[in-house]
Amino acid sequence: MRKQQKIHVKIGDNVKIITGFDKNKIGKVSKIDRNTGKIIVKGINFKFKHIKPNAENEVGEIKQFEAPIHHSNVKLN
C-alpha cells in the first residue's frame, strides 16, 4: 500500500498551472487522487482518445477528456 501524499490544494480551489503546455492558465480543482499525487483541473490538460469502429459501433469517434496533472505543477491562485 502506498503512502498518501500531502497535497496543498483542495477540491474547489482555483489554481494556476505553472509548468507544461497549459502554463499560466487558471482552473478549478475537480478531483484529487492522494495515492498518486495527481489532480484534475476543470478545463485544463485535455487529451484525446481515438476509438475504432467495431461490430456494435459502426463509426469510430474521438473522445476528449481531462487528464490528471501532478499537484506540484500548480499553485493556488
From Swiss-Prot:
Keywords: Chloroplast, Plastid, Ribonucleoprotein, Ribosomal protein, RNA-binding, rRNA-binding. Pfam families: KOW, ribosomal_L24. The keyword Cell membrane does not apply. Gene3D superfamilies: 2.30.30.30. One of its GO terms (cellular component) is chloroplast. Disulfide bonds: none annotated. GO terms for biological process: translation. PROSITE patterns: RIBOSOMAL_L24 (PS01108). It comes from the Eukaryota. It is found in: Plastid, Chloroplast. GO terms for molecular function: rRNA binding; structural constituent of ribosome. The keyword Glycosyltransferase does not apply. Part of the 50S ribosomal subunit. PANTHER family: MITOCHONDRIAL RIBOSOMAL PROTEIN L24. Belongs to the universal ribosomal protein uL24 family. One of two assembly initiator proteins, it binds directly to the 5'-end of the 23S rRNA, where it nucleates assembly of the 50S subunit. This is Large ribosomal subunit protein uL24c. The lineage of its organism: Eukaryota, Sar, Stramenopiles, Ochrophyta, Bacillariophyta. The gene is rpl24.
